[in-house]
Amino acid sequence: EKSVDAGKLESYYHSLNDYFERVKSKPFILNDEEKQPAAMDIGIGTFWKDSRIKFKDEPEKDRHDAIVESRVVSTQPTIPEEIAMHGFFIGRIAYAQHEDESLMDIEDVNRNRYSAMHNGLDTKLYGTNGELGEATEILEREIQKAEQGLEYAEIEDPGYMDLLYDRLDSGTPADLMAEGFNNGREEGMDRKEALKRGLDYQVK
């Protein structure tokens, strides 16, 4: 698991000082004192973690903003799935805030991350209470919480969450693409034709 650490957090950020120390721990390409503000921007820009904090300073507009950038949501195959996945995260965060949930153990988060990356839905995941269960069962509960969170946030879902429920039954996009490719090969297609079939995956 330690070999797959791109984006992974070893622990939650405890404060802005903690965050800055982590950014500073990586090599900087600008060390000139006059260029330190630019060095910080570049340092944060090359701090490849799933969550990072950026700062927007526009004195002429009296704007001094801290922006939390989440890089957790991976790009989806289609726009409807993209909307569904972002809707899930918005709803899930709203649920956690409304219910005042505690943060999961970071080790469980990283184990889930590793398991999902390597095994997709064919694995076991840790739930928010530390219980270990089948990925599809854990994720079904998470989608339900996201739906509740969207209600808390007064955001109407016209059916995007159904795409995520369907995915629990049909498999991930990667599963479907692999199935299309393998079926094509079994039917005698060459690799290029089979690959095209695999890439023809679309939301129905």
Regions found by a protein language model. Give the residues of each.
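Loop-rich catalytic cores of soluble enzymes, especially ATP-dependent carboxylate-amine ligases
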Residues: E1-S74
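Intrinsically disordered, low-complexity N-terminal regions enriched in serine/proline/glycine
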Residues: S11-Y12, D18, P27, L125, ...
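Generic alpha-helical secondary structure signal
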Residues: L16-N17, V23, D32, E99, ...
